[in-house]
A protein has these predicted regions:
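A short SAM/SAH-binding and catalytic strip from SAM-dependent methyltransferases
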Residues: 43-57
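A short acidic, Gly/Pro-enriched loop at the edge of an enzyme's catalytic core
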Residues: 33-45
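Conserved class I S-adenosyl-L-methionine
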Residues: 73-117, 121, 133, 137-138
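Short conserved AdoMet
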Residues: 20, 55, 69
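C-terminal lobe and adjacent flexible extensions of AdoMet/dcAdoMet transferase-like proteins
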Residues: 145-206
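Short, glycine-/aromatic-enriched active-site segment of Class I SAM-dependent methyltransferases
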Residues: 46, 79-96, 148-168
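Class I SAM-dependent methyltransferase SAM/SAH-binding core
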Residues: 1-35
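A short glycine-rich, Lys/Arg-flanked "PGG" loop and its adjoining helix->strand segment in the class I
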Residues: 58-73
Length: 206
């Protein structure tokens, strides 16, 4: 087998270093719309936490579909738009989003990374562990911000804080939005995970 990894950013080099012991892994510093892989050549595809950071997510999904063989599975994760959350939760998110847009995402890379690490230490970690304690006590923690991180490592929190606050462009989608984009891209048999983080789904190229 052969694993083809594609990323337009320098993150591709980190992936390469992590997988360097595998001689069947190949790396392409390319965008999906200009990818050098042949069309309809791939047995499967996945995109986890990338396509919500680009301007035209619909087109990007179509570009992914072009590279897949008929019947190939495609695993996708996109930020969801908090469609099932209460008004207070959404208000808190909007306030943090303003901080991201107006301040943090505009900082130089090193300062940005430091600020996001501080956010992970002072906000992500305490709220996550508070949610864990409440869960142990038998309380429902679904509507507590960052409760999804209650069983995750600090490394994940730190990485996600940078991904969340360090990027200038972030899009969010409802389950219906994602379903429509996948169907418009030629996918069917779409199944969504009922577990957080939302939305993760598997579909197949028709």
């Amino acid at each position: 087998g052969r694993l083809n990894c594609i990323d337009p950013s320098s993150a591709i080099y980190l992936a390469e270093s992590k997988l360097k012991k595998y001689d069947n892994a190949f790396f392409y510093k390319e965008t999906v719309d200009a990818c050098s892989l042949e069309n309809e050549s791939q047995d499967f595809g996945y995109s986890l936490g990338v396509l919500h950071h680009i301007p035209d997510t619909q087109k990007a999904i179509k570009d992914c579909a072009i590279k897949l063989k008929k019947g190939a599975p495609f695993l996708l994760y996109l930020y969801y738009d908090f469609e099932d959350k209460p008004a207070l939760f959404k208000l808190i998110w909007k306030l943090t989003d303003l901080i991201r847009l107006k301040v943090i995402s505009k900082l130089p890379p090193r300062i940005k990374k430091t600020i996001c690490s501080i956010i992970a230490i002072t906000i992500y970690y305490p709220l996550a562990k508070f949610s864990r304690i409440l869960e142990i006590l038998g309380l429902n923690v679904e509507n507590i911000p960052l409760s999804d991180y209650r069983n995750k490592s600090f490394y994940i929190m730190s990485n996600d804080a940078l991904d969340r606050f360090g990027t200038k462009l972030e899009q969010r989608f409802s389950k219906k939005d994602i379903t429509n984009m996948l169907k418009n891209s030629g996918f069917h048999k779409i199944t969504f995970s009922n577990k957080t983080p939302y939305w993760t789904c598997i579909s197949y190229k028709a």
